[in-house]
A protein has these predicted regions:
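Residues that define the loop-to-transmembrane-helix transition and helix capping
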Residues: 30, 88, 114, 174-177, ...
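Membrane-interface interhelical linkers
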Residues: 1-31, 35-65, 75-85, 133-151, ...
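Selected transmembrane alpha-helices and immediately adjacent juxtamembrane segments
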Residues: 145-169, 177
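Hydrophobic core positions of alpha-helical segments in small-molecule transporters
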Residues: 8, 35-36, 66, 93-96, ...
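Hydrophobic transmembrane alpha-helices of multi-pass small-molecule transport proteins
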Residues: 42-44, 103-106, 116-135, 270-287
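Alpha-helical transmembrane segments of compact multi-pass small-molecule transporters, enriched
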Residues: 39-43, 93-108, 122-123, 186, ...
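Interfacial helix-capping/hinge residues at the ends of transmembrane alpha-helices
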Residues: 16-21, 29, 78-79, 90, ...
Length: 288
């Protein structure tokens, strides 16, 4: 169940990321990140009001911090990288995230990944390496600033996930919606804090979009944050964090597939090899 929830979250985010890339290039990375986190905050706030659940306030600061790190800071770097690398190439770096999270989880939660999980991580990284070679052979160079932006995004996203899991270990009974709402609030507060520096023209730039693009960005922001995060936190609450993060290796493959389906790029033999590596890795990931 946790793997299916995590895969669902990755599927939705990968699809949304291909659309976020368009807006990162057309407007800016900081704009699409700020816009989608505001949509997430509104959706989760409304859901929290409707459900009427009261959060455990003693652990609320952890979720606020997690949201600020993962949903605001990490996604700011990722959306900036989208404009430079594209969604698939940016998300491919996420397959290295298990190495960071496994280390933190080992020291904080005593989570020791099994040998099959380690093998899965190896194949996911091989999947990323395959896509990396394609980028280099096609363009003859590495997009260093974009890669660094993506790397910063990974580290901050991993810290956000570890912080969330730490708080859930303190109180496993906290509801998924409360966790999501508090994380979204943390991201929104981060946006308000840094707005004088970022100077994001949230409403003005939105008004400049065509009616069709307004609908697209609203739908992408909703499924890429509200729905995707609900699935992801549900998985984190009941699953092994390192294994779930390893499954994020699916995101570049999924994003690449969506890019092909939407006519943004062409299918290549590298993508086919990456798909095979992913299937092998996924087999070891779910193997007992």
């Amino acid at each position: 169940v946790p793997f299916l929830l995590a895969f669902g979250a990755n599927l939705l985010f990968s699809f949304s990321a291909t659309l976020f890339t368009d807006f990162s290039r057309e407007v800016s990375g900081k704009w699409i990140n700020s816009f989608k986190l505001c949509i997430a905050f509104i959706c989760f706030a409304l859901t929290a009001v409707v459900l009427g659940e009261s959060p455990v306030w003693s652990i609320a600061p952890y979720f606020l911090l997690s949201g600020a790190l993962g949903l605001f800071c990490a996604d700011h770097f990722l959306c900036t990288a989208f404009a430079k690398l594209g969604s698939a190439r940016t998300l491919m770096i996420f397959s290295f995230s298990p190495l960071f999270v496994a280390t933190w989880s080992f020291f904080l939660f005593n989570e020791e990944p099994s040998y099959s999980k380690l093998i899965a991580i190896f194949f996911f990284i091989a999947c990323v390496f395959t896509l990396s070679i394609e980028k280099f052979r096609k363009e003859g160079h590495w997009e260093i600033p974009g890669l660094l932006m993506a790397l910063f995004g990974i580290v901050l996203d991993g810290l956000g996930n570890v912080t969330t899991r730490y708080a859930l270990n303190i109180n496993p009974n906290e509801s998924v919606m409360n966790v999501c709402a508090l994380r979204a609030l943390g991201a929104f507060l981060g946006f308000l804090l840094f707005q004088p520096i970022l100077k994001t023209r949230l409403i003005a730039d939105f008004k400049k979009l065509s009616r069709r693009k307004k609908v697209i960005v609203l739908i992408a922001s909703t499924i890429g944050t509200y729905v995707s995060l609900t699935f992801w936190i549900s998985a984190v609450k009941i699953g092994n964090l390192t294994s779930l993060i390893a499954l994020s290796g699916t995101t570049p493959l999924l994003a690449g597939t969506f890019e092909i389906a939407m006519g943004k790029t062409k299918a290549t033999s590298y993508l086919a090899y990456a798909f095979v590596l992913f299937l092998i890795g996924f087999y070891f990931l779910i193997k007992n």
